[in-house]
Amino acid sequence: MIRIGHGFDVHAFGQDRPLMICGVEVPYHTGFIAHSDGDVALHALTDALLGAVALGDIGKLFPDTDMQYKNADSRKLLIEAYRQVRAQGYKVANVDVTIIAQAPKMRPYIDQMRQTIADDLQCDAMQVNVKATTTEKLGFTGRGEGIACEAVALLIKQ
């Protein structure tokens, strides 16, 4: 049996912290306003994984009202969510992540992002795709106010 999940997340810029995308620190003058480290890509991916096995979403598993997740490393959240996916008897066939941002440019970091996700999901980097696009200066991402991300996860029965 195969299962598919979709995730979406968005965070605004504005906090003095590192900008984390797909578990990689991307040089930029500001970070995200968020309860955790704000990694929109890993949050969207976590939602996709959880959704594929009907385990809800990142907010259910790691509520932002719980102080233990304050400034949490999103890689740890992804790893825990994937542990729960595996406990349901599924593993990653492939994942696809789309980062929607006017800036900063993601291309120099894509290979590292793919490998980081592959490491966290215990799969080959060829099972992970990360790409970035802009909104041609339209909307909040186009104005440089934040970043959005979508992710899809295809899971197969172990």
From Swiss-Prot:
A divalent metal cation binds at residues 9, 11, 43. Keywords: Isoprene biosynthesis, Lyase, Metal-binding. One of its GO terms (biological process) is isopentenyl diphosphate biosynthetic process, methylerythritol 4-phosphate pathway. It catalyses: 4-CDP-2-C-methyl-D-erythritol 2-phosphate = 2-C-methyl-D-erythritol 2,4-cyclic diphosphate + CMP. Binds 1 divalent metal cation per subunit. Belongs to the IspF family. This is 2-C-methyl-D-erythritol 2,4-cyclodiphosphate synthase. The lineage of its organism: Bacteria, Pseudomonadati, Pseudomonadota, Gammaproteobacteria, Pasteurellales. The gene is ispF.
